[in-house]
Amino acid sequence: MFEIFVDSAANIPAELVKAFKIKVLSFVNLVNGKEMTCFDPDLTPEEERQKGKDYYDMVRAGANIKTGLISSGVFEDAFREALEADKDVLYFSLSKNISGNYNSARIAAEDLMESGNYTRKIRMIDSLNASLAQGILAIYASEMREKGMAFDEVADILETCPAKMNGVFTVGDLKYLARTGRLSGTAAVIGNVLSIKPILRGNKDGYIVQYKKCRGRKSALNELISLVCNNIVEPEKQIIGIAHADAYEDSLYVMEEIQKHIKVRGFINTSYDFCTGSHVGPDTIAMFFMGNDRELQGMK
């Protein structure tokens, strides 16, 4: 038996966390000097959406927000509990080239394994991405576990998936990318004036890079739809992830348009994690799906 862990950047809604028996370790943000836990396991989907709206309204209003890492001590305590219950540990991480979280978990895992106190194993999978790119892989792992597949078999299969799991997104305001150094302040101002909406993606090394520029929000949303429909493989077997930073109507639009073109197993449509979402800003729409690789083909 094994436990499946994610950090709250994985964006798995609370009801699915319970259904798939996934353990979530939450980021904690400082909002105007007060701690705010990013994941609440007891919220309904409606409450999650309202909390997301309230949070991103605070971001729009200029709240002072600081994000941080989950400490190695928190990881160590969580992993130890599973090991002491005679269970292996499988952890799906936010890309180590986006966050230092992977390293925190690695330190915890090494300390536990080097102690010699446990016969069970810890395996970590770097999603090379963020948000539902992590979450969907964790859900697939849970489904394999439910079928009775062995720990190493599940981990071996899912270790091959980050190279195929695509994440593409567009933002509402370029100033948030400028704050994180992904765009110059001057370029952000000019881009906003001209209504330039970049399409960004996670590349094969787990870095966020620009894919192309679109003129206007609707054009950017349609480009996201095209990228999903043109690059997804075996969509009828896949869950497509949609994470939005208080852009619910736009999330419904892209979901409905995709269904006009391809038949998919299902969607997860949820509010963007507050930690990573703070860096991309309100009105961001991100989409996650499996392709043959991460070399995207655009509109056809």
Which stretches of residues belong to each language-model region?
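Beta-sheet entry/capping signal
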Residues: M1-E3, D88
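N-terminal glycine-rich anion-binding loop in soluble enzyme alpha/beta folds
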Residues: E3-I70, V74
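Short beta-strand->loop
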Residues: S93-S95, I125-L128
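Glycine-rich phosphate- or other oxyanion-binding loops that anchor nucleotides, phosphorylated ligands
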Residues: R60-K96, N103-I107, A155, P162
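Mixed-charge interfacial surface used for oligomerization/domain docking
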Residues: E3, A9-V17, I22-K23, F27-M36, ...
